[in-house]
């Protein structure tokens, strides 16, 4: 695969109308309507008519004439502040690695290295369960820094939270994002007991990972991590162990990385572009994003082939895209940050998400209570209709405007990449819907495992 593939998808994804997007696939001609994220098969004559309507600025008229010109499903009104249903605790604002691009600035978020006291963690849990209410659902995540630096507090808080949730009939799920260097057999047993979703940060094969995620001494960390992971990968029943790969200019061989980690036994493998880093180190530039899209499409096409053949291929980005398209995902925000999801610093300060810990841009109160005024302001300002370039983009309700942290601190350098990826995903969806409709019916294919 060459960059010509990525450039073709980027060109095909370019916004010609904020209301519709036209696609062609092996199955024919298709219309994507931004309002409601609806996808239709259309006859060639209507396809041509819609293309002409874009050029003549008459899209609304044509949509109304064919019966899909409904009133907007998303207006300019910000989302009313919902109850908090998910918290991520920066339970250790310290780390034993010296990752070259770390947004948390080696784990301490630009401040003094510290652990979260158990009293602060318990207050955060109390806030979460109070917001969830009896019989509700909630999620508790542990991040850092490296959360296992503060293992005793993590374990005690988890056990207490599980007991309190059970008494109140709250379905509470747990997750952790770890660098993997401190994992042990005992951790595997603990995570399995509590059904943790474990995400391990890995940047590729040894020679790549050790350049971008070394110890602070400069020594490589890959071999130790893979040894530590063996007991976790071997006992995935209630627990799920996934790999998260941060893409920098150092590690753009996505297909090799995906195949290696699938073979290692991970529940899922996902890629995330590095778009905003302190000092800019490791950030992807335009040429890098073209290379990444090449790799993503290569992995996506492999996913298509494997899925049609009835084989498991847990490419998380592709699985999520297929599920989002299938259910008509349609949202005014990219995620729940600042709404139902907040981050908590080691000192008990609330932030819009884990990436805004210690950042005044995303301050949201303390574990004593959410600052509803700041939250309301955030939800008003971060609405996709308030993001100038997004209002002219057909993909705005699939994308939601892009990661808040990245767009606030760097802008939107990846829009062409995102649209190119979504254009490919829409065509892949149309193919798979015809070849494997049962996979979508099951809707449980969170890892690409056929029913």
Question: Which functions belong to the PLM regions below?
Answer:
Residues 6-7, 211-223, 230, 234-337, ...:
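Radical SAM enzyme [4Fe-4S]-AdoMet core and its adjacent flexible, acidic
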Residues 7-41, 54-88:
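N-terminal [4Fe-4S]-dependent radical SAM core
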Residues 14-17, 355-451:
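Flexible mid-to-C-terminal extensions adjoining Fe-S/redox cofactors in radical SAM and related proteins
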Residues 91-98, 149, 338, 390, ...:
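Cysteine-centered iron-sulfur cluster-binding motifs in ferredoxin-type domains/subunits
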Residues 121, 125-141, 150-274:
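Radical SAM/AdoMet-radical enzyme domain recognition
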């Amino acid at each position: 695969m060459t960059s010509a593939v990525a450039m073709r998808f980027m060109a095909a994804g370019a916004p010609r109308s904020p209301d519709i997007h036209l696609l062609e696939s092996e199955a024919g001609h298709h219309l994507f309507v931004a309002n409601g994220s609806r996808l239709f098969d259309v006859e060639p004559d209507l396809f041509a008519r819609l293309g002409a309507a874009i050029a003549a600025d008459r899209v609304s008229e044509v949509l109304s004439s064919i019966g899909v010109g409904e009133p907007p499903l998303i207006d300019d009104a910000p989302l009313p502040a919902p109850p908090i249903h998910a918290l991520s605790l920066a339970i250790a604002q310290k780390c034993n690695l010296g990752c070259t691009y770390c947004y948390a600035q080696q784990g301490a978020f630009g401040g003094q290295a510290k652990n979260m006291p158990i009293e602060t963690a318990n207050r955060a849990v109390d806030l979460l369960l109070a917001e969830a209410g009896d019989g509700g659902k909630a999620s508790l995540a542990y991040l850092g820094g490296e959360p296992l630096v503060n293992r005793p507090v993590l374990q005690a808080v988890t056990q207490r939270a599980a007991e309190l949730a059970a008494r109140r009939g709250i379905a509470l799920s747990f997750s952790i994002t770890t660098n993997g260097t401190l994992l042990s057999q005992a951790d595997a047993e603990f995570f399995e007991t509590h059904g943790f979703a474990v995400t391990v940060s890995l940047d590729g094969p040894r020679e790549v990972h050790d350049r971008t995620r070394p110890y602070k001494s400069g020594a490589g960390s890959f071999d130790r991590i893979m040894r530590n992971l063996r007991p976790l990968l071997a006992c995935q029943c209630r627990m799920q162990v996934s790999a998260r790969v941060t893409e920098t200019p150092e590690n753009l061989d996505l297909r090799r990385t995906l195949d290696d980690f699938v073979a290692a036994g991970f529940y899922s493998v996902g890629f995330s572009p590095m778009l905003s880093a302190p000092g800019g180190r490791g950030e992807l530039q335009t040429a890098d994003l073209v290379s990444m899209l090449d790799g993503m499409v290569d992995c996506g096409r492999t996913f298509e082939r494997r899925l049609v053949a009835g084989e498991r291929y847990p490419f998380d980005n592709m699985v999520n895209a297929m599920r989002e398209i299938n259910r008509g995902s349609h949202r005014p925000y990219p995620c729940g940050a600042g709404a139902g999801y907040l981050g908590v610093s080691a000192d008990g300060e609330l932030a819009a998400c884990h990436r805004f810990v210690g950042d005044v841009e995303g301050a949201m109160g303390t574990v004593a209570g959410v600052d509803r005024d700041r939250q309301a302001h955030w939800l008003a300002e971060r609405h996709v209709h308030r993001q100038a370039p997004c209002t002219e983009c057909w993909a705005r309700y699939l994308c939601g405007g892009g990661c808040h942290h990245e767009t606030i601190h760097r802008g939107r350098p990846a829009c062409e990449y995102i649209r190119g990826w979504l254009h490919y995903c829409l065509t892949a969806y149309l193919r798979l819907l015809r070849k494997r409709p049962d996979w979508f019916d099951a809707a449980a294919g969170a890892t690409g495992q056929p029913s």
